[in-house]
């Protein structure tokens, strides 16, 4: 709202200066046409009046330039604030899962670039048309990609939500290469910790909440117009901020139930295998019973080793997740300590915040008013009145004009 009002004021001042300049040019041309016919007193009076109006237009133009500088500072301050919030949100996402911001930005760029048709070269090769000339067929072709982009974004959202539900239900899965084909269970190998993907996040760090936040970010990105969509991560940041308690609860529950769910699933499988093998051994001969008991012991030993490896891997995942969540927070705290508030007012010709010793300009209409000693070449407090270099140059210029 403030920016729009300042732009409106700047536009009004610009129109006022332009109208004044047009009128002064017309008066000057009439003055030179009628100068020889009139008396010297009339010529002096008209000349002084025209010069006075020119100086007034010049002051209005200077005020317009100062207003433009204020608008530039305001926009720059807001941009720095947005960049800091975006960097902070990226650090929070990286703390939960490393590499997710790069994946989201890459997918956003893929959505920004529409896919080119295959037969584009063959369709337009026989009609030599200039690049800047309007072509209705090509315009129609570009508009046809909007539903395709929408379909891609919807498919991406459905994939993210389905992956989140799968990751919440599945436990820790390891590959048991020594198990035979007669065993009742097969454990699939889990993906290594070094490879990160939205669909295959580590369940020990609350994959469901992270994937849902990523889905919300992609949805907010898809709803925006084509252009710069990096700042659309603000939508998922608001989702984290509004649902902080629920997300924290989900993270803690996910960490606590990983080891228990995997171990309970393996124990129930072991008991079922033991009972089935015992029933088969009763109906067979004694030699077969001995063979089955030995095979059962080997399978139980392999399953117990897989259970211990599953529990150890879950503890390793929790330790890694705790380390990744602690270290970036300390880095962010150290970064915040060295940065200043973007809303803090700026002073001096260097456009920086207040620090050290500063001197004030005695001109009441000075737009800056306060200056650092080093920027204006002072080492101690000046005696008497002191004016900044800009005000001094403006006063000298006005004095020379009045002479």
Swiss-Prot record:
It holds the Pfam family ING. Gene3D superfamilies: 6.10.140.1740, Zinc/RING finger domain, C3HC4 (zinc finger). The modification N6-acetyllysine is found at residues 166, 249. InterPro entries: ING3_PHD, ING_fam, ING_N_histone-binding, Zinc_finger_PHD-type_CS, Znf_FYVE_PHD, Znf_PHD, Znf_PHD-finger, Znf_RING/FYVE/PHD. The record marks 347, 358, 362, 370 as: Histone H3K4me3 binding. Residues 290-310 have a biased composition (Low complexity). Belongs to the ING family. This is Inhibitor of growth protein 3. It comes from Pongo abelii.
